[in-house]
Amino acid sequence: MTQAAGQAPRTNGLNGHMLMAAVVSAISGLLYGYDTGIISGALLQISEEFHIGNTIKETIAAGILLGAVIGSLSCSLLCERFGRHRTILLICCVFIAGSLTCAVAPNAVGLALARVLLGFAVGGATQTVPMYVAELAPKSIRGRLVLCFQLAIGVGIVIATIVGASEAVSWRVSIGAAAAPALLMLLGQLRLPESPRWLILRKGDVEGAEEVLKEVRPKGYDIRTELDEITALARRQQRTDRSHQGWRGLRQAWVRPALVVGCGIAVFTQLSGIEMIIYYAPTILTDNGFPRADALRVSVALGVVYLVMMIVGLWIVDKVGRRRLTLVMVPGAALSLFVLGGFYITGHDGRAYVPAIVACLLAFMFFNAGGLQLMGWLTGSEIYPLSVRAAATSVQSATLWSTNLLITLTLLTMISAFGVGQVFWIYAFFNVAAWLFVWWKMPELTGHSLEDIERHLKNHEFQPDDFARS
């Protein structure tokens, strides 16, 4: 890669404020993983208490996703007008309110509606927090800091599966307990500054942005050159017609390649089958003859593998590269689903084949969590130009959650109509399509500053080969 003039030197140290930003990002990711994952085990208790069938189960599971679509779209407007910092404070408050409202829901309908409120916070967090951290972080560790969010999703899922596997814990307690980390997130965010890039672009506050950079950069970091680069870009943005900024700016032809890549990755992270496994693994297994306790233990094991691969990805993504890592891992996920589906289609799904079925599930989680899942929020945080970043990340987040919503609302119905093996094969083919998309469209962004990525877009150089030459 050619170093652009005026780039800040690579400095890998973290100071207290940047570490706190990573912690807040991690808590928001933990809440996302926990609030979405807890429903997997809780549905078994909820269905017994409220006497509900598959349609209501799908509605309860999907409530958080509908709220996430609304939250991701709404929070883009809020973080552009009021700033990333204050928007995250609002999200923290909604996390608290949503968790407590779910815990006291009187019936299935009330629970589904409460999960819509909780989903607003989840969607808002996925749209705002990775972008906020990316705008605060130095480029040399930006990928790893943003992936703290993704890593914490894995932690949340593991905690949720462990809690869900303990039938001694009421589903009301397990869902309401999420209010505690949400309160910690609120207290942590109160200590953090606004994004320096937002301060310059929206407020013209160069001095304020300089103070923020002094707070979040380690000693010895060349703040002036980084500030000059941000300021120069912001001046060019401000000279741009307002019709080329925000939501209206998404119509520009030079922005479109970033939207295609970002939204395409968002769709395929969901179509890869990850949510099918997270939400419904216990239900699918018990419906096909697994003892309930064994199904819950498998769910915990899947969560642990997810977390381990998030940790591995956190440390290698800035070394191996986003594109290369994804291309290596996706074929393994596809093969796992093809083999898994084959067991069910050929009738080899009895107790004698339980170890092989579980091995396929774990292998899928290994390859999926260690590859494609890492890219969902990372690409959205770094791929879009500053003038449209909030709107574009909102579209990407809403695309992801809408795809997730569609899958969650239809999965159990699809399994009833076609069979579990056939559904596994459908998702295996989606993984094949994901690999082709990444190979064809996704450039290697590792080592490029946000401003350098934007220059490639403006120069119409956003194909994988364009970045390979730079």
Regions found by a protein language model. Give the residues of each.
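Transmembrane-helix signature of 12-pass secondary carriers
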Residues: 1-470
